Amino acid sequence: MIKFSINKTAFQNALKITKQAIGSKVTIPALTKLKIEVEEKGITLIGSNGQISIKNFLPADNKDASMLISGTGSVLLEAAFFENVVSQLPEVTLEFIEKEQKQVLLTSGKSEITLKGLDSEIYPHLQEISEGSSLKMKVKVLKEIFTETVFAVSTQENRPIFTGVHLETLSTGELKAVATDSHRMSQRLLPLEDTDLKFDVILPSKSINSFKNVFTNDEEEIEIFISGSQMLFQNETISYYSRLIEGSYPDTNRLIPNEADYTLDLVFDAAQLRHTMDRARLLTVMTTNGTVKLTVSGDSVVTTANSPEVGSVHEELTALSKEGNDLSISFNPEYLIDALKVIKAPEVRIRFISNVRPFTLQPRNEESGFVQLITPVRTN
């Protein structure tokens, strides 16, 4: 039967990470539980919501954990309640003792709390991924790619393939990450080190958002495996599984204009442009079409927004450079603000074809393989 003592902070941190995969709205009641497996070599915490699964291993020789294991076994505990109980324990160290009929006694200082557990045999078997070809990447790089694309996914569940980020290895030795909700698109290309792993998958946005909270050390390297309908991200102690979205992602390369198609090329200070859009948005949220108009005439660049109920906004913008024809185009400022949020460069390049064709954004003077596309709104 299980018996161990452990540093409360180390255990609590592991609990917090594992609980990222445990949800209250699940079809299988056992998935609201935390599975605890104790072996002589260490403690494994397991959580899953059917879409995301996390195995978090605390090795017995972890110095921060100050772990002492004197009994092994496994048990299920109500995840949310157990985490709250552990957080309220008074001392630095907690002791975990399994009693008869899967009851668990937690002691810390003068505090004793008894919890009702369940047999771990009722917990669903989690599909494993056999370790074969893999791709190694720094957490920081992967987070950047996800941040630069995930905001553009669709929130409409009736088109599931657009609710995730499309990840594909190309014959050019690059990783392509792209997301679109059909109104905007964000695409990032990243050169890869030598890898035999080839894939063309759609990773759900919910998995991406949880990933950022699970792998907190940006400088560490993780290994990526793919098998069938699952993707595995793994470091020395954490295995993070995600189900993939079924279906074929459309070819988004055809959406990106050819260089010869552009008729207007503008460069702006990214921060100034974002502040201008923020001010315009204050008014556009009060209008039915929610659009701002950008008018380029000679050396003049002006943004305007009008609301019969509230008023109007008129602001002159300074273009750092301008090449091409005059243009007047309307669009949703929210999309441009979201796009600018993920561009780290101080200057942004925006290129247009016409007032009814999508326009593109890229960091200026940066061959990063990062391009975004926004569809304009037709107005009378």
UniProtKB/Swiss-Prot annotation:
Main location, first listed in the record: cytoplasm
InterPro entries: DNA_clamp_sf, DNA_polIII_beta, DNA_polIII_beta_C, DNA_polIII_beta_cen, DNA_polIII_beta_N
EC number(s) stated in the UniProt entry for this protein: 2.7.7.7
Superkingdom in the source lineage: Bacteria
Gene Ontology CC entries for this record: cytoplasm; DNA polymerase III complex
Subcellular location: Cytoplasm
Family recorded in the similarity comment: Belongs to the beta sliding clamp family.
Function: Confers DNA tethering and processivity to DNA polymerases and other proteins. Acts as a clamp, forming a ring around DNA (a reaction catalyzed by the clamp-loading complex) which diffuses in an ATP-independent manner freely and bidirectionally along dsDNA. Initially characterized for its ability to contact the catalytic subunit of DNA polymerase III (Pol III), a complex, multichain enzyme responsible for most of the replicative synthesis in bacteria; Pol III exhibits 3'-5' exonuclease proofreading activity.
Quaternary data: Forms a ring-shaped head-to-tail homodimer around DNA which binds and tethers DNA polymerases and other proteins to the DNA. The DNA replisome complex has a single clamp-loading complex (3 tau and 1 each of delta, delta', psi and chi subunits) which binds 3 Pol III cores (1 core on the leading strand and 2 on the lagging strand) each with a beta sliding clamp dimer. Additional proteins in the replisome are other copies of gamma, psi and chi, Ssb, DNA helicase and RNA primase.
Descriptive protein name: Beta sliding clamp
